[in-house]
Amino acid sequence: TLENYEVNGFKVEGTLTRTVKGFTGTWLSGTWEYEVEVEDGKVTGPNNTYFTWESERTVTVSLPSFEVSTTGEAEGVDLFGKAYTVTITTPLVIKRDCEHIVSGVLEVSPTGVEKRVINYGNGTCDKNVTITIGDKVYDVTL
């Protein structure tokens, strides 16, 4: 549980729980799996605006590559008081030698507007993502 925790003037609240689900294989070639749950998550800015979220994710770490794969979903209320959901439809993958997500698809569904689909690509270590909103596609460099 976060208490009196701030980052650059933003107050962060909530309860984060990690549960180790298990390890398979050997230390040289194995897989860790754990669940991460956020309850009552809230970030409040210096001007007292805030957003909230709750999430459940499953994280898998593969050895020896330290490739990390994440699945799951979240929901909350944005800065304007509108509900949203986030669903990882294709696992988000991070590789040890890359600073960005290298593959996976994330869907963001804010209330009252079209769903946003964020595609991180096919595994190449680059800064490129594609964002699709309705029939419009945007190529974005992170």
Label every PLM stretch briefly.
Residues 12, 84, 115-116, 138-140:
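Short, isolated positions in well-ordered beta-strands
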Residues 8-95:
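Short helix-loop boundary/capping segments
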